[in-house]
């Protein structure tokens, strides 16, 4: 068991539902209410930020915390174990007083920061993922750190937190960004052998934060939106005060004109005075647009479509269909009107996220936008055997009574089942003291309907201060089973079901 010192907080992203835990725990034979389906054989894993050392509440950004992965293993109708582990980056090893087992090569990505955003399995590996050019890590099945991952040297400069798995081929598609790439993002395909088989550099208007993208059967969809790299947030922690203004001017003059070599981009890893600020901010002068590229195309094949200024972390799904003889692209997204404008510590203070649908007529170039549900919601998931094709159902987590900025009695996190065909929705009947995070869809064996499956995700019962793994019927939203955990799991970001192979 490893324990870090807990820090006092005056930051809503360090409190309540979002507060970090200070102890690594291993527990076996977990108590269960209800019955775990016998066919579930694997691990539910979720990643999220969990600072290992004291941070400055005034500047700490939710997205910059050290990575901690939480997992529950299910087999034979039982919850075999729960584990939570920090990913052993050099900074985490130093904070815990442990030797650094493997230091990333500069080509692998930016060492500063941690892979705190997603966790999934691919080609026999468990991968802790992050974006912005930061190094990703491989974990063991028991969530201990193996070391940095660059797909056996086939992909340099970092990856993404949001790859999309092609349900037909099993390959991982991704769009990756980093300030070190200049005015470019990179589309990549990781084969089922775990190696990058294709990369394409795509020119964009600046240096945007591009958290995710959409994949259809025929296209890659890129969201080039007005949250961009802000050198003002980087310089103060890394250079003397008298050099700050010249350094900012240098960064602003270089950024986007050249691609920064990997060793130079990695220099910040050795600078003293780590900052917990996020170096991205709302940029009202930056054009908002959507790029559409054929899967086998290149930069010259990208078509750009202007949209109203906004920000999207999470597209729900995308597909194309024929309407009146024209090909139309349908994009379902969770949309914010702005991001990191007034509140620079997290996504909660600028606007409420709504579920929107954008359609692009690829023949005429016309773009239409429709708000499908204006209730605040996030973390959209579907039956991912349908990625890239038409879908009907989606599952989102609502945020009511204060968007991600506290865990008082006013905060609730309803679970919505969205019918994207009729526009209607159903709300799960959850205990009002239960706060939940992202819910993952796991299809049932021999499923005969799109929604024939299980929803799986972590919750916190604030009345009992208890962490839980919830299993819900995806058709009815009724409880199937609850696994009672030995500690609270912070809300975190993204997770996935990793079946035993």
Swiss-Prot record:
Keyword Oxidoreductase: yes
Disulfide bonds: none
Entry binding sites for Fe cation: 162, 211, 314, 494
Cofactor: record remark: Binds 1 Fe(2+) ion per subunit.
Any GO MF annotation of the entry: carotenoid dioxygenase activity
Keyword Nucleotide-binding: no
Annotated InterPro entries: Carotenoid_Oase (IPR004294)
Name of the molecule in the record: Carotenoid cleavage oxygenase
């Amino acid at each position: 068991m490893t324990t870090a010192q807990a820090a006092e907080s005056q930051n809503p992203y360090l409190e309540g539902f979002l507060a970090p835990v200070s102890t690594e725990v291993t527990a076996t034979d977990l108590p269960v209410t209800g019955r775990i389906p016998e066919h579930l054989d694997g691990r539910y894993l979720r990643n999220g930020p969990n600072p290992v050392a004291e941070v400055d509440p005034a500047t700490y950004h939710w997205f910059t915390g050290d990575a901690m992965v939480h997992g529950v293993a299910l087999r034979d109708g039982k919850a075999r174990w729960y584990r939570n582990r920090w990913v052993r980056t050099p900074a985490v090893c130093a904070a815990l007083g442990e030797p650094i087992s493997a230091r990333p090569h500069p080509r692998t990505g930016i060492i500063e920061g941690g892979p705190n955003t997603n966790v999934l399995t691919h080609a026999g590996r468990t991968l802790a993922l992050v974006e912005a050019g930061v190094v990703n890590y491989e974990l063991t099945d028991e969530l201990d750190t193996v070391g940095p991952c660059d797909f056996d040297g086939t992909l340099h400069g970092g990856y993404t937190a949001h790859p999309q798995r092609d349900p037909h081929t099993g390959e991982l598609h991704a769009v990756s960004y980093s300030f070190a790439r200049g005015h470019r993002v990179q589309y990549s395909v990781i084969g089922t052998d775990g190696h990058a088989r294709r990369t394409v550099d795509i020119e964009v208007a600046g240096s945007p934060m591009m958290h995710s993208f959409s994949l259809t059967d025929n296209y890659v969809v890129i969201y080039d939106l007005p949250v961009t790299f802000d050198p003002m947030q980087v310089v103060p922690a890394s250079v003397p005060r008298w050099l700050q203004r010249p350094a900012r001017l240098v960064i602003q003059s270089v950024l986007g004109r050249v691609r920064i070599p990997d060793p130079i981009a990695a220099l910040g890893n050795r600078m003293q005075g780590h900052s917990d600020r996020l170096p991205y901010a709302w940029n009202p002068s930056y054009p908002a647009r959507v790029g559409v590229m054929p899967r086998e195309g290149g930069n010259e094949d990208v078509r750009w479509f202007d949209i109203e200024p906004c920000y999207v972390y999470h597209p729900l799904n995308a597909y194309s269909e024929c309407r009146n003889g024209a090909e139309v692209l349908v994009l379902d997204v969770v949309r914010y009107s702005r991001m990191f404008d007034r509140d620079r510590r997290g996504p909660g203070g600028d606007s409420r996220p709504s579920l929107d649908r954008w359609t692009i007529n690829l023949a005429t170039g016309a773009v239409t936008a429709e708000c499908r549900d204006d209730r605040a919601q996030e973390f959209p998931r579907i039956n991912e055997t349908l990625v890239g094709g038409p879908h009907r159902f989606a599952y989102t987590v609502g945020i009511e009574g204060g968007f991600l900025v506290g865990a008082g009695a006013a905060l609730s996190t309803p679970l919505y089942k969205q019918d994207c065909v009729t526009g209607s929705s159903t709300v799960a009947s959850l205990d009002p003291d239960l706060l939940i995070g992202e819910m993952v869809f796991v299809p049932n064996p021999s499923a005969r309907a799109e929604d024939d499956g299980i929803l799986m995700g972590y919750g916190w019962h604030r009345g009992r201060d208890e962490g839980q793994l919830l299993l819900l019927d995806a058709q009815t939203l009724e409880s199937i089973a609850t696994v009672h955990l030995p500690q609270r799991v912070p809300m975190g970001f993204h997770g996935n079901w990793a079946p035993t192979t």
